[in-house]
Every structure is written in structure tokens, then in C-alpha cells.
Amino acid sequence: NILAIGDRECSVQRRHQKIIEIAPSFDLPEKTRLSIQGAAEKLAKSVGYYSLGTFEFLVDSKSQGQEKFAFIEANARLQVEHTVTEEVTGVDLVQSQIEIANGKSLKALELNETPQAIGYAIQARINMETIESDGTVKPTTGELTTYDPPSGPGVRTDGFGYAGFFPSTNYDSLLAKVIVHSARSNFKEASKKCERALSEFRIEGLATNIPFLRGILKSDDFLTRKATPRWVDENAPSLIENSEFETRHILNEQLNPLESGPVSYTHLRAH
């Protein structure tokens, strides 16, 4: 009655805070993946854990098949990035958690074995913040004058906002999450889809980290899956330069819409 639903890659962080998450974890040897899932199941069973939870591990990428990984922590809840697991497995984790709390078994939920992950899913966290060249994060605030999230096949936006909304600075800076799913096992294709979705997200009235996220998604290190938890902090200057280019591009589209072409101007959506 214990089941590992899947795994995620959460290495892209700034100041130890996740900003981009991926499912499934890429370049993870199947033997290591199964060992990690087995460790999570063993731990959950040993403490009599009931409900859904998140078990985090750190993998030594230099171990080369030696399965060196360490347990970090267990969270007795779903994480912000549960969305990418939902997209690649087709399992509604929130609904499943509620049904388990109401007494349903995994068998009743037809969760008899670990679901096969289909393709890649990527989540980008839209935060009300800007990032300086030294990696310093500065929170932003203001009244939203435009809040128009992306949509279309394989594109999901979880968030809250509207024109006239003034987000409180007393809470987390997270404004929205953009989640994309590509059914093909092509990581670069999924990354491009996420970057394109972010480019379609129109937020005006306050600054966000969207340009920075787009810069990351276009980075060669990210696309070749070399990012580690310290990668963003160590490469902040070059990533900032990329994000500044994206900022100028966004402003140019807003100020000169006709020069950007009819699609950018009319902001077409597929439903």
C-alpha cells in the first residue's frame, strides 16, 4: 500500500529556492531511479506514513553508476512543483490526496504500480522580483494593469491575477506557475515550448522574473542538462545579460507591436 508516483528534477534554483522544475528527472540511470523510489517507499512504510508526500534526495552526478544519493527531507504534503508529475503521469495528485484522506485505497484509485512518465513537463515559477548581476534578488510590487496568461495544447497556468489587482508584499512573491507538457521525449523541444509560453504571458504594472526564466531556458547549459543547484548563482552575470536582452525584446514588442508581426500584436491563442 505504498507507491512511488514518479520523480522530478529540481536543480535549477536561485539562492536555494526552486524556480524551474522538470519531470521526470533527466539523465538519471534507471537503476538509480528505482533505488531512490525504493528508498522513499521503504522510509514511508517504516514510519507508517499515510497520505501523499514528497521525499527529496540529492544525487551525486559524478558518481557514474555508483548510485550515490543522499536523503534530504520528507514533506508531509504536495510541493509547488507537483504539477509536472501530474502532467507526465496523468494522475491528479490533489484529488488523489483528498480521496485517500476520505478512506480510498490505492487500488480503488487504480494506482497499482508506478505510472509510466510520458514525455517531459517543465514548470517555471513567475515571481514578482528582479535579479541583479551579482545574484541579488529584489522583490517588486505594484498594481497589475495586464494579466493575460498563455494557453493552448500542453500549456497550463496556475496562478491568480487580474487588471487592478495589487498583490500583497506580506506573502510569497510567487504570482503564477507556467507548466508545459511535451508528449515526446525531447527535452529541448519541451524547453522551447516553455520559453514560448512565457513569451506569451503578458504581465504589466509590475516587474517579474519572466525575462530571467526565458534566459535560463535558452541557455546551452540548461539545454544540455548541466545545471546544478549552484548553477544559477555561479552564472548570474551571463544569465542576467540574456534576461536583459529578453526585457528589451518584450519592451520593443509592447512599444512597436506592428513591427513584431500580427501574431505578437493580436496575441493569438489556441484553445
Please annotate each region the language model reported.
Residues 59-71, 217-228:
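Short glycine/threonine-rich loop-to-helix capping motif typified by GTGT followed
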Residues 22-64:
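A long amphipathic alpha-helix within ATP-dependent nucleotide-binding catalytic cores
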Residues 5-16, 58, 65-78, 148-168:
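Flexible glycine/proline-rich, aromatic-decorated loop/lid segments
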Residues 40, 83-269:
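Catalytic cores of soluble metabolic enzymes centered on carboxylation/carboxyl-transfer
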Residues 1-9, 31, 35, 58-69, ...:
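Phosphate-binding site of ATP-dependent enzymes
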Residues 1-38, 78-95:
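ATP-dependent carboxylate/phosphate-activation module, predominantly the ATP-grasp catalytic core
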Residues 49-51, 65-66, 78, 118, ...:
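Short flexible coil/turn linkers enriched for glycine and charged/polar residues
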Residues 56-61, 74, 176-185:
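Active-site and channel-lining beta-strand-loop segments
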